[in-house]
UniProtKB/Swiss-Prot annotation:
<comment type="function">
    <text>Required for genome encapsidation. Forms ribonucleoprotein complexes along with TGB1 helicase and viral RNA.</text>
</comment>
<keyword id="KW-0687">Ribonucleoprotein</keyword>
<dbReference type="GO" id="GO:0005198">
    <property type="term" value="F:structural molecule activity"/>
</dbReference>
<dbReference type="Pfam" id="PF00286">
    <property type="entry name" value="Flexi_CP"/>
</dbReference>
<dbReference type="InterPro" id="IPR000052">
    <property type="entry name" value="Pltvir_coat"/>
</dbReference>
<feature type="compositionally biased region" description="Low complexity">
    <location>
        <begin position="7"/>
        <end position="27"/>
    </location>
</feature>
<feature type="region of interest" description="Disordered">
    <location>
        <begin position="1"/>
        <end position="27"/>
    </location>
</feature>
<keyword id="KW-0946">Virion</keyword>
<dbReference type="GO" id="GO:0019029">
    <property type="term" value="C:helical viral capsid"/>
</dbReference>
<dbReference type="GO" id="GO:1990904">
    <property type="term" value="C:ribonucleoprotein complex"/>
</dbReference>
<keyword id="KW-0167">Capsid protein</keyword>
<comment type="similarity">
    <text>Belongs to the potexvirus capsid protein family.</text>
</comment>
<keyword id="KW-1139">Helical capsid protein</keyword>
<protein>
    <recommendedName>
        <fullName>Coat protein</fullName>
    </recommendedName>
</protein>
Length: 236
């Protein structure tokens, strides 16, 4: 067993003790390396997020779409059209896509979405292009179609889509000019609130009873705790 070596040195009235361990790993070696300022200013970073489709995902989807005869020169526009459509109707796995976009060579949005789901979640794909759709909507003053149905105020209507959090995600694809404007804090709060309400309502539809005895369920098929939580939210 290796024992520490102690060195004691007296300087005037001050005594200092240095303890070293034989065979210790040097401080600047392998995983023990201590970074300096040059590293932080020159290091290369590849931003990735598990909430957003990866570049590898896009490569796979692109191959599938190419096999579906989506023209290469309008493939990006077909993706943007699909994601803009999802801003209107939603991007959950259960959402039914409507119609056919103008850039997909007659291939329906439903088929495009089905191909995406073979590789990643539709919402992950939508987040990848959220900044593109954000600029598109602002440029045309065209908010998501269902903003009123979702209970958004007029001043927050451009945040009324379920992949809004992708707008500021650094792993998303951002237009060359950048965002026309970043989302306002009030829009972020409205989007987060809408997400919370949707999740809570969805949980309220599930049966969380530990027993099917009528004394427990009182004849109800679903639980109500979550729904009641939404109704009785405390004031801000």
């Amino acid at each position: 067993m290796t024992t520490p070596a102690n060195t004691t040195q007296a300087v005037g009235s001050t005594t200092s003790t240095t303890t070293t361990t034989a065979g210790a790993t040097p401080a600047n070696s392998g995983l023990f390396t201590i970074p300096d300022g040059d590293f932080f200013s020159t290091a290369k970073v590849v931003v990735a997020s598990n909430a957003v489709a990866t570049n590898e995902d896009l490569t796979k989807i692109q191959k599938i779409w190419k096999d579906m005869k989506i023209p290469s020169d309008t493939m990006a526009q077909a993706a943007w059209d699909l994601v803009r459509h999802c801003a209107d109707v939603g991007s959950s796995a259960q959402t039914e896509m409507i119609g056919t976009g103008p850039y997909s060579n007659g291939v329906s949005r439903a088929r495009l979405a089905a191909a995406i789901k073979e590789v990643c979640k539709l919402r992950q794909f939508c987040r990848k292009y959220a900044p593109v759709v954000w600029n598109w909507m602002l440029t045309n003053n065209s908010p998501p179609a269902n903003w009123q149905a979702q209970g958004f105020k007029p001043e927050h209507k451009f945040a009324a889509f379920d992949f809004f959090d992708g707008v500021t995600n650094p792993a998303a694809i951002t237009p060359k000019e950048g965002l026309i404007r970043p989302p306002f804090e009030a829009e972020m709060n409205a989007a987060q609130t809408a997400t919370f309400v949707k999740i809570t309502k969805a949980r309220a539809q599930s049966n969380d009873f530990a027993s099917l005895d009528a004394a427990v369920t009182r004849g109800r098929i679903t639980g109500t705790t979550a729904a009641e939580a939404v109704i009785s939210l405390p004031p801000p």
